[in-house]
Amino acid sequence: MTNTNRPIRRALVSVFHKEGIEVLAEAFVKAGTEVVSTGSTAKKLAELGVKVTEVSDVTGFPECLDGRVKTLHPYIHAGILADMTNPEHAKQLEEFGIKPFDLVVVNLYPFADTVRSGANEADTIEKIDIGGPSMVRGAAKNHATVAIVTDPADYALVASRVADGTGFSLDERKWLAAKAFAHTAAYDATINEWTAKHWPKPASLDAVEVDKDDQGTEVDPAKFPAQFTRTWDRAHTLRYGENSHQQAALYIDPLNQTGFAHAEQLGGKPMSYNNYVDADAAWRTVWDMAPAIAVAVVKHNNPCGLAIGATAAEAHKKAHACDPMSAYGGVIACNSKVTLEMAESVRPIFTEVIVAPDYEPAALELLQTKKKNLRILEVAEPPKGHEAIRQIDGGLLVQDTDLINAVGDDPDAWKLVAGEAADADTLKDLVFAWRAIRCVKSNAILLAHDQATVGIGMGQVNRVDSCHLAVERANTLADGADRATGAVAASDAFFPFADGAQVLIDAGVKAIVQPGGSIRDEEVIEAAKKAGVTMYLTGTRHFFH
């Protein structure tokens, strides 16, 4: 087998973050490696005992433009890009008096950190690295003879190969190059995400440049750019995915440190994949009810119960009462501070996760000491609207996140089509039910009373079955109580036939809110009129798949 290792005799080092560079310095000194470096990196290496040649001494040209130009010079880039297995490249370097590099170590200006710090536009732009990515890409392209290192986690490996004189094999250099290209791709994607948000197309160009999709439809490039580029940083791997045979990891947005993915865990076992899915769903659900105090109990990405209360404890008791059996092993979310009274209510119930913006000290102590396995999460801010992204085979589907912000979500826009106008209390329940239906998997039917769910039918492939399920849960999960009678109902989409609405009417609901839009709307409305049941049409649908 051919030996493809190339010893490291000459290295170019230019790093913004200096952490861990000591291990490289020690190896360079031990091996007598010739080191070329820039500015503060050169100073740090010299302090560590490395004999360093400044880049400006190689190029014969000083740094200029406030440091914007340091390494952008043929004497540097020819030394990086020369393939020393190519005799012509070697000959040209000799003609120009340029020495090749065997190793390039670079990490980039902290663009994402600068954005997260809230820096102004000018300071943010200064942290867009130019020379660094150029060196990284050049060295990665020329992996035939150059090893490129961008990850400080690889410094120990590099140091050992420098010190023992073996260098890296071709396959190892390819692996390092692949990491480097991933690094610069993520860096550029982060810059692209920031510029797309802050530098939209000006109105002055609307008439001269029209963005169209592959079917000729005009598109708003700010919402759906021609290339969809995003980058997420791996936070940590998870024990497993949705099932034990699936691997999984959590990735976070590098441009902000807020949101559910950045939740602070105050107690309990590590979060699982399913914990994240359910807790995120619960977190979104309770904020649909803001500014009212709300608690949601979620399991398998569906609500077991949701309620509004005068206090967090009251909201939790009402939400739990909807379906106590299903709440076992569920996730609880609260959009206000968890009080000691609420914590005492949660204590006897087996719960996987609780998430809230804050906790009373006594409540937190009780949950931490009496429920040691309970995952306790604190998220400082409500969820933000963002793109909903779903991967399909060979592509992505991207849409706006479904929020309670459509015209039809405003009860003032509802159309009364049957029965008498709802009184104040009934209307409050209808508004609650309509806001709650967004979080229920389609086909979804939800029964509510006193601003709390009392029966939920979700995930059925026909609406009639969802109606039956909602009524059944309302009437069989409450010690024989008939909770459907006098309740209100919400449907996430129209009733295609009158049969589904009739199930609710026969169960005794007094009012129904639904989008309308069926070709048989009149049949559905007539059934409500015949029974004297109030019915409102919203004109807005909330499918959830």
Curated annotation (Swiss-Prot):
It comes from Bifidobacterium longum (strain NCC 2705). Keywords: Hydrolase, Multifunctional enzyme, Purine biosynthesis, Transferase. It comes from the Bacteria. GO terms for molecular function: IMP cyclohydrolase activity; phosphoribosylaminoimidazolecarboxamide formyltransferase activity. Belongs to the PurH family. One of its GO terms (biological process) is 'de novo' IMP biosynthetic process. Residues 1-150 form the MGS-like domain. Disulfide bonds: none annotated. This is Bifunctional purine biosynthesis protein PurH. InterPro entries: AICAR_Tfase_dup_dom_sf (IPR024051), Cytidine_deaminase-like (IPR016193), MGS-like_dom (IPR011607), MGS-like_dom_sf (IPR036914), PurH-like (IPR002695). The IMP cyclohydrolase activity resides in the N-terminal region. One of its GO terms (cellular component) is cytosol.
